[in-house]
């Protein structure tokens, strides 16, 4: 299992946690015997260093500290079940907002298959473009909107992706209420300009 620290744990990018079973380590060794594996991608070397309580690359200590702080907070606030509830609460709010908006719908129609950690909304109003919304959000000058709301590279072009991670709003939906009001305002201004 491999997971990045920058998503649900709120740490900076470029760091990850790798959890390997003994069987996975055996496969890594077998592959290493069959072909050349670059040192930085060699899981058997990573495991060897881990057994020595060392790293074979100098990690970002800030990310390790942030990861540890996030884990402590998560454990104190419901652990996995609590974080699951929080992410689902964020996603539920976004779904309800999108369905009331008149210009958004969840990209994945079947609720069973929707991600509740990274929620993608398709823009249903043909007069609206995600790029225009993003530029307008960036122009607000609000720090957390300086990049707008980017779609995932593999998602359809005219869509918005909003993170539902625990640390976006660790206390509920207040940050999502602010964000959606801002998006609604920007969209209303864009629609007025198109008239």
Give the ranges of each region predicted by the language model:
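Structural signal for terminal/edge beta-strands and the immediately following C-terminal loop/tail
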Residues: 166, 170-195
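Short, low-complexity, polar/charged sequence segments that are solvent-exposed and flexible
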Residues: 20-23, 36-39, 138-142, 182-185
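Active-site C-terminal subdomain of aminotransferase-like
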Residues: 6-96
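Polar/charged alpha-helical tracts
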Residues: 26-30, 76, 100, 127, ...
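Conserved C-terminal alpha-helix-loop-beta "cap" of PLP-dependent enzymes
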Residues: 99, 103-174
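Predominant activation on well-ordered alpha-helical scaffold segments within soluble catalytic domains
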Residues: 62-72, 92-95, 131-134, 138, ...
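Flexible, glycine/charged-enriched surface loops at secondary-structure junctions
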Residues: 77-86, 103-110, 147-152, 190-195
């Amino acid at each position: 299992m491999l997971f990045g620290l920058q998503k649900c744990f709120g740490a900076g990018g470029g760091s990850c946690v790798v959890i390997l079973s003994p069987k996975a380590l055996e496969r890594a060794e077998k592959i290493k015997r069959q072909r050349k594996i670059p040192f930085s991608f060699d899981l058997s070397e990573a495991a060897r260093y881990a057994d020595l309580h060392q790293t074979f690359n100098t990690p970002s200590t800030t990310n390790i500290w942030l990861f540890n702080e996030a884990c402590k907070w998560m454990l104190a606030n419901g652990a996995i079940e609590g974080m699951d509830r929080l992410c689902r609460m964020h996603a539920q709010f976004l779904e309800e907002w999108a369905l009331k908006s008149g210009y958004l719908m969840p990209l994945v129609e079947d609720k069973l298959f929707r991600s509740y950690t990274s929620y993608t909304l398709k823009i249903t109003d043909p007069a609206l473009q995600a790029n225009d919304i993003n530029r307008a959000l960036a122009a607000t000058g609000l720090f957390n909107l300086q990049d707008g709301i980017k779609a995932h590279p593999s998602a359809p072009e005219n869509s918005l992706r909003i993170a539902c991670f625990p640390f976006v709003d660790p206390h509920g939906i207040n940050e999502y209420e602010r964000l959606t009001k801002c998006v609604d305002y920007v969209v209303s201004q864009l629609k007025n300009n198109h008239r």
